Amino acid sequence: MTLWINGDWITGQGALRVRRNPVSGEVLWQGNDADAAQVEQACRAARAAFPRWARLSFAERQAVVERFAGLLERNKGELTAIIARETGKPRWEAATEVTAMINKIAISIKAYHVRTGEQRSEMPDGAASLRHRPHGVLAVFGPYNFPGHLPNGHIVPALLAGNTIIFKPSELTPWSGEAVMRLWQQAGLPPGVLNLVQGGRETGQALSALEDLDGLLFTGSANTGYQLRRQLSGQPEKILALEMGGNNPLIIDEVADIDAAVHLTIQSAFVTAGQRCTCARRLLLKSGAQGDAFLARLVAVSQRLTPGNWDDEPQPFIGGLISEQAAQQVVTAWQQLEAMGGRTLLAPRLLQSETSLLTPGIIEMTGVAGVPDEEVFGPLLRVWRYDSFEEAILMANNTRFGLSCGLVSPEREKFDQLLLEARAGIVNWNKPLTGAASTAPFGGIGASGNHRPSAWYAADYCAWPMASLESDSLTLPATLNPGLDFSDEVVR
């Protein structure tokens, strides 16, 4: 029984799904997808639970969420192993994900009060108040690269605001989704407040097509995000928050410490085997001898990155990709770029057949026309050389995406120029593209999102504002508008 609907674990009525470790092939989880009727059932449960959950005080909802945080802490080792085994990422990185989930609780509580709490302003004849109200029933679509942390970034603020939820994990990480749901169950969530439906495309389509849905919170690919946007385009009454990918540029301008810059680049491009939406996909490198030296060092150090299994000792920097198919897609993308005229500096290699262990790839595309503006979701870095900083900014902005952008340079003036001209929601200076602050919004523009950033701003899309003018008594104004007559004289 792998679906959690209205406080009960039930068996899915859809197709059988089996999840294997992407490196070893070990069977980790199996269960049946939710069919359309069960998705409807989950929605009815969420709708029925909404009034009571929304009427609880914030402190009461906060208490449940904080119990969940405590359970995460006590079960950190077990959840770390589940996420690592299912995604293929190393144990150390899965542990940082669970830590981020724990930290998200306190951050979300604070963000609720700052972004969507209550405010009151006194007026001469009363007061003006601002409150926030939950939307109702929200669907949360989770991604596979951070199957605990990223859905958590939607679920926690949505629950705090008073919404009820139908959560569909990625079909590639059902075990992680179930493990997190069991912790929510232990935290004492009332039946129907959070429901879990497993499945792939058909389950997702049934969920997004629900009429009695007040909103959808999505993290995933741009293609799927565009499909959801089209599907809900005629329904402005439904909130839609899209967090999508990027074709992110990292500009290496002047480098004081080559090894430090190489380290930053590897952290930007290859952490999580290149499976972060903020990963650097395009390296824009200044022409000249220093750039040549940097590139040679980058290739040399990247060549030493050997992917390993989740529990290998010593621990590897990167593990496997989410699937063998995903790894093969990266290899295919590299082959296509090479066929277009790209110059391979480091060829990506599958370490063995029927696994997702893939070494990083680096290919120079300077002077090659018609390079697709697409996100390759894996450890493949494309390199372009530039002559002037103005040219670098033009190249950085030459994308339909707009998630992250970074600059390595000792010059504050150049960063200030980039801040003015960059088209990206995250712009970093001498910091990895994959780094983000929990007290800042996280999201992009263009094909990277729809102006509903998550993280610190997640509270914004989990509640709607209600403005009120208030007075505890009613009296006739001393001064009336022209044309109003309240005298006792009878008009004949």
From Swiss-Prot:
Catalytic residues as annotated in Swiss-Prot or TrEMBL: 243, 277
Record has NAD as a keyword: yes
Reaction equation(s) it catalyzes: N-succinyl-L-glutamate 5-semialdehyde + NAD(+) + H2O = N-succinyl-L-glutamate + NADH + 2 H(+)
Biological process, per Gene Ontology: arginine catabolic process to glutamate; arginine catabolic process to succinate
CDD domains xrefs: ALDH_SGSD_AstD (cd07095)
Pfam families reported in the protein's UniProt record: Aldedh
Record-listed NAD(+) binding positions: 220-225
SUPFAM superfamilies registered for this protein in UniProt: ALDH-like
Main EC class the enzyme belongs to: oxidoreductase
Its EC number(s): 1.2.1.71
InterPro entries, per the entry: Ald_DH/histidinol_DH, Ald_DH_C, Ald_DH_CS_CYS, Ald_DH_CS_GLU, Ald_DH_N, Aldehyde_DH_dom, SuccinylGlu_semiald_DH_AstD
Domain of life: Bacteria
HAMAP family to which the protein is assigned, alphabetical: Aldedh_AstD
Primary role: Catalyzes the NAD-dependent reduction of succinylglutamate semialdehyde into succinylglutamate.
Record's protein name: N-succinylglutamate 5-semialdehyde dehydrogenase
Originating organism: Escherichia coli (strain ATCC 8739 / DSM 1576 / NBRC 3972 / NCIMB 8545 / WDCM 00012 / Crooks)
UniProt gene name: astD
